[in-house]
């Protein structure tokens, strides 16, 4: 059954009125074993494609403006029924050992045209997702590119997100959060949340957070943009050619920590197991943008180390063109031990214990997992 615009919005208001949550610090009694429900990008929007976007313009490119309008129509179709079902299914699968919930950025579509509407969209989206988990489970999100997207001339979208995110995360985590890159502890583990939107990724800040948590059992890197590039060789953490030196140093630092990278952005399901000279990096890319009904069922496009780099989509070139892409991917090819690349949308459960770390994938609004990936 489709939900009406009124039902959709009143649901968000009801979720916003739920009782206050417990701080994360109060939940660490779950100890060394816990689960985390995870959503990838969701591009929260209204069934009415104009509801949040009435004031949006793109003053320098009509081509991009028309492309963005098409995204609003796509979102309105998703958010009439499929996307709410997916989010609620994640809540229905919540386990008693859940420590917090994680959303991988692009919480919202953006493109609001003014700061007030952008803030309302963030608040509505957060309330909707948090409500799906009952209102009491802490919800952590990371800055995505759509979370700061507005008119290229500036409509306050980035400034709104950069104020909203630290304030909201501080309330959820029960600890001070100074910016859009921060860390928190869950039992013996550390989660380092990185804002990948240029020019925000700061190597010194990430190095400090790594140093402060060097006693962690597992080091999780939470970044909207992937750390290991594949199908989109420009949109990844420190992916600009001007940041090659920093990118390589960051890769080395993460490998030394045997980091587990949790990412989004590509609207694909992706799994990586990479062995570098300094150590191992595991990466999982989550997608919850259910833009096509058939994406509720997994379609694997490539699997196994030999498939890495074969499936390309979106912006290419790392700013320089196809030859540069090949050179970039060659830095990673020899390190890849395990790989999966699929068209799929759904919700996920991260499972963490002394025995290892895994991700269970639930296609679409399913309540039983269709596949489990071992990250550690």
Where are these regions (language model features)?
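C-terminal/domain-terminus segments
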Residues: 103-123, 276-281, 357-376
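N-terminal export signals
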Residues: 2, 7-26
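Extended active-site neighborhood of metal-dependent phosphoesterases/phosphodiesterases
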Residues: 27-28, 59-62, 112-218, 236-260, ...
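N-terminal active-site segment of His-dependent metallophosphoesterases
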Residues: 24-116
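Histidine-centered catalytic micro-motifs
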Residues: 222-227, 261-269
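Active-site glycine-centered loops adjacent to acidic/histidine catalytic or metal-binding residues
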Residues: 41, 105-106, 144-145, 224, ...
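Short acidic, glycine-rich surface-loop motifs adjacent to enzyme active sites
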Residues: 215-232
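Short, solvent-exposed loop/turn elements at domain surfaces
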Residues: 36, 44-50, 201-203, 230, ...
């Amino acid at each position: 059954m489709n939900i009406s615009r009124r039902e959709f919005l009143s649901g968000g208001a009801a979720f916003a009125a739920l009782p206050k949550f417990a701080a994360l610090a109060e939940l660490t009694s779950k100890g060394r074993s816990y689960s985390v429900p995870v959503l990838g990008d969701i591009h929260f929007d209204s069934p009415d494609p104009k509801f949040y976007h009435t004031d949006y313009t793109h003053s320098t490119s009509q081509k991009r403006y028309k492309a963005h309008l098409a995204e609003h129509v796509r979102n309105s179709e998703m958010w009439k029924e499929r996307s709410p079902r997916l989010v609620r299914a994640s809540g229905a699968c919540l386990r008693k050992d859940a420590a917090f919930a994680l959303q991988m950025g692009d919480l919202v579509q953006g493109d609001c045209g003014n700061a007030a509407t952008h803030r309302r969209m963030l608040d509505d989206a957060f309330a909707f997702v948090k409500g799906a988990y009952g209102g009491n489970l802490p919800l952590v999100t990371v800055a995505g590119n759509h979370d700061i997207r507005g008119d290229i001339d500036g409509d306050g979208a980035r400034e709104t997100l950069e104020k909203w995110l630290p304030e909201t995360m501080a309330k959820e985590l029960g600890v001070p959060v100074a910016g859009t890159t921060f860390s928190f502890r869950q039992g013996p583990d550390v989660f380092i949340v990185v804002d990948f939107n240029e020019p925000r990724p700061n190597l010194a800040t990430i190095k400090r957070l790594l140093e402060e948590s060097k006693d962690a059992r597992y080091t999780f890197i939470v970044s909207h943009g992937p750390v290991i590039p594949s199908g989109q060789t420009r949109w990844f953490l420190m992916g600009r050619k001007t940041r090659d030196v920093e990118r390589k140093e960051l890769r080395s630092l993460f490998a030394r920590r045997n980091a587990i990278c949790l990412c989004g952005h590509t609207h694909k399901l992706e799994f990586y197991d990479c062995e570098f000279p300094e150590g191992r990096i595991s990466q999982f890319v989550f997608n919850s943008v259910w833009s096509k009904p058939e994406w509720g069922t997994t379609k694997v496009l490539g699997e196994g180390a030999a498939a890495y780099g074969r499936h390309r989509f979106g912006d290419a070139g790392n700013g320089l063109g196809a030859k540069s892409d090949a050179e970039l991917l060659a830095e990673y090819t020899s390190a890849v031990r395990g790989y999966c690349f699929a068209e799929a949308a759904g919700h996920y459960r991260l499972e963490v214990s002394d025995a290892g770390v895994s991700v269970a994938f639930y296609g679409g609004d399913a309540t039983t997992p269709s596949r489990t990936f071992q990250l550690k």
